[in-house]
Amino acid sequence: MNIISVGVNHKTAPIEIRERISLSEVQNKEFITGLISGGLAHEAMVLSTCNRTELYVVPAMHEVTGEYLKDYIISFRDARKDVRPEHFFSRFYCGTARHLFEVSSAIDSLILGEGQILGQVKEAYRIAAEVQAAGILITRLCHTAFSVAKKVKTKTKIMEGAVSVSYAAVELAQKIFSNLSMKKILLVGAGETGELAAKHMFAKNARNIVITNRTQSKAEALAEELGTNRVLPFESYKEHLHEFDIIITAVSTKDYIITEADMHGAMQKRRLKPVIILDLGLPRNADPEIGKLQNMFLKDIDALKHIIDKNLERRSLELPKVHSIIDEELVAFGQWINTLKVRPTIVDLQSKFIEIKEKELERYRYKVSEEELRRMEHLTDRIMKKILHHPIKMLKAPISTSDNMPSRVDLVRNVFDLEEPNQSH
């Protein structure tokens, strides 16, 4: 009935170790099917991302411990030269459930509240289910984790506020110009940072985006992806600065690509209509003197990082609420686990009483009328349910600190002389 979790993540191991243990989808399927076909596990799932590789296993043998699973995956990845057991964490029973709930809720992420992890957990579950490795325990564990993540997202603010430079830039632009769909935007630089900023803008309903890049084909590819198909030659974009309400720069360069003189002329043509320049370059792309011009809002990476720090601080204040949700769901999950543990005993108890009832009724089958037999059957059913009510209620009751589930199960099995159950999980 145990659920073990072992793995490496950004807290326990550096990236070069995490890379050695990570599994592709094909390797993931091979790994978990090997555990099950080898008789080592009843159920298994692997969550493998850039920041973590974690095993969730319902062992089929007492020998399959946390240490055993660490050694098993190290051997599977042929990583003995690089990876040691100390790089791993281990969780057991409800500790495993708590860990997955925290992971799914994005409070165990490298960036607090980074919501991408939930999709990755769902993908891990899909893979396990696809190869019939997700049984009743892992299925319930994962669906509870999905429910926890949904509650955390709707009932807390742990995922609110930008925590990346590109998203912080867009969030700031939206605060200054509330309706981005009405603004004309110039993106200078179509690299990774610029692309992210453009996609965040697009997600905020900005559609009037013009792109310029030293390599024009790269600008054209991004414009096509966004569906704007609007590109300016890099050699001539400065001639159009006055046309834009928002300018995002994300270019690798030693010199300023937009000077104070460039924007002074642009502002005169705009008749001082406000402009935001979001400088995502390092070194900076825009001359800091631009910020002194009237109706000019210039924000560089340092200013945006200040916004990010504030947002992370606000997110951390939500942690008590998140833990409260997790604690509540953990209690319910633990109670379900306990019910699962006693299910064989409840079934055996009911079966024994049904067997006794049927044997006794059989003795009178030819001594009484069919109507009398039906009445006797109805009466014995009622008596049986009343007798069984209390022992079943006791078995299902939550465990207190002075009690434990095995002693309850043993008591009932001994009192009612039940045969030892077959151990499956």
UniProtKB/Swiss-Prot annotation:
Judged by the first EC level, this protein's enzyme class is oxidoreductase
Instruction: Show the SUPFAM superfamilies listed in the entry.
Output: Glutamyl tRNA-reductase catalytic, N-terminal domain (SSF69742), Glutamyl tRNA-reductase dimerization domain (SSF69075), NAD(P)-binding Rossmann-fold domains (SSF51735)
**Record-annotated residues binding substrate?**
T49, C50, N51, R52, S109, E114, G115, Q116, Q120
Q: What does this protein do?
A: Catalyzes the NADPH-dependent reduction of glutamyl-tRNA(Glu) to glutamate 1-semialdehyde (GSA).
- Give the similarity note: Belongs to the glutamyl-tRNA reductase family.
HAMAP family, alphabetically? Glu_tRNA_reductase
Describe its assembly: Homodimer.
Protein name, per record: Glutamyl-tRNA reductase
